[in-house]
Amino acid sequence: MSLPTVAIVGRPNVGKSTIFNRIAGERISIVEDIPGVTRDRIYATGEWLTRKFNIIDTGGIELSDEPFMTEIRAQAEIAMTEADVIIAVVDGETGITDADEAVANILYRTDKPVILVVNKVDNPERRMEIFDFYSLGLGDPYPVSAVHGIGTGDVLDAIVQNLPNEIEEENENVIKFSLIGRPNVGKSSLINAILGEDRVIASPIAGTTRDAIDTHFVDSEDQEFVMIDTAGMRKSGKIYENTEKYSVMRAMRAIDRSDIVLMVINAEEGIREYDMRIAGFAHEAGKGILIVVNKWDTLEKDNDTMKNFELEIRTKFKFLDYAPIVYVSAKTGQRLNKLPDMIKEIHHAQNLRISSSVLNDVIMDAVAINPTPTDKGKRLKIFYATQVAIKPPTFVVFVNEEELMHFSYLRFLENQIRKAFVFEGTPVHLIARKRK
């Protein structure tokens, strides 16, 4: 189930990033930070009062070539498009500015909840000044001091009160997937090609609270698919459409809503940092992954072309050694007919359940091949293992001492499990737990 999203907006220097870090870093537990986005962390996942949500700092989306006012307007537009709840931040020291009013004027157009946060209210005397901010027309102002953590809990309470109701899990038999990649890798052509070959379009439906359009279709075997929209702002032509950080943010949202991610790479350009960042996020999120190398028809080939390209993929995507690779051409249709079946195979692997008896036979055979490690004369002892989750398949291995289970031995056990069962295309998680 995808998580609701909270976006932070406001002019520069009002403390958006400090509020983001305060919310994400102390008063809630971070479930997962995005790998590779430590320098410009704009997206985190957290929990408050048992509700999980994603939080976006639109201030991290820099549009540096644009005029000041255009930039902050764009960030407000992004929030209105992406978020379920919007936090509008203003500065309690400087008071209301033209830029604050510009943001407020844009937010008037949304029917999404807006929480007005007055930052830098560091002493009781300044609390009396927050009433001036009622003139923005954004509701009751929440006084906070992000630096000192004052008032953060009240803001989090307001966020949770305004989150959309949790919906029941969707039909597990429906396969949700998205095509992710840099601009110009050919995602649109691939989408059109996938939908154009003997597919029955069931219904284009509007996304839950956003304007994104997901596409439902069934294949010849009556398997239902949902292609998660990643275009999002097709209508826009707006200045932020091609900024890399905004592109990353949209990709992360699509990954969050997907079961399986088709990581699309341009054969002409190879793998870039963007690809590695997004692939890392999909991997950490436990999604099924299929690597799709598009525009394969454009390369001059010899006997080693495919082997060398695969070597590059496996070298740069070391953490995706389980992900299958397919070389396609949206233009010529080369190998496109393989995609639906490969997606279904990954979906099957994600949902595979292994009985404890069969699993423990594999574990004991693995220990016989490679005995458990020792540390300071004490040997790791494995009592038994059991599967506790699917999507991704997750196993708990009960041992005498968790500290004795080295990462390398867990990886060995994972490899033995992968040899015994078909888990191609999905991460497999192994967790060591001390038997009580």
Curated annotation (Swiss-Prot):
Domain called KH-like: residue spans: 352-436
- SUPFAM superfamilies given in the database record: P-loop containing nucleoside triphosphate hydrolases
PROSITE patterns documented for this protein: G_ENGA
Which keywords does UniProt give here?
GTP-binding, Nucleotide-binding, Repeat, Ribosome biogenesis
What's a GO biological-process term for it? Answer: ribosome biogenesis
Q: Is GTP-binding given among the entry's keywords?
A: yes
| Ranges of residues in domain EngA-type G | 4-167, 175-351
**Pfam families of this UniProt entry?**
KH_dom-like, MMR_HSR1
Q: Which residues bind GTP 2?
A: 181-188, 229-233, 294-297
Q: Which N-terminal residues, if any, form the signal peptide?
A: none
The GO molecular function terms of this record are: GTP binding; ribosome binding
Report the domain of life of the source organism: Bacteria
Residues reported to bind GTP 1: 10-17, 57-61, 119-122
State the protein's purpose. GTPase that plays an essential role in the late steps of ribosome biogenesis.
The record ties this protein, via HAMAP family, to: GTPase_Der
What family, per the record?
Answer: Belongs to the TRAFAC class TrmE-Era-EngA-EngB-Septin-like GTPase superfamily. EngA (Der) GTPase family.
Q: How does it assemble?
A: Associates with the 50S ribosomal subunit.
Q: By what name is this protein known?
A: GTPase Der
**Origin organism of this chain?**
Lactococcus lactis subsp. lactis (strain IL1403)
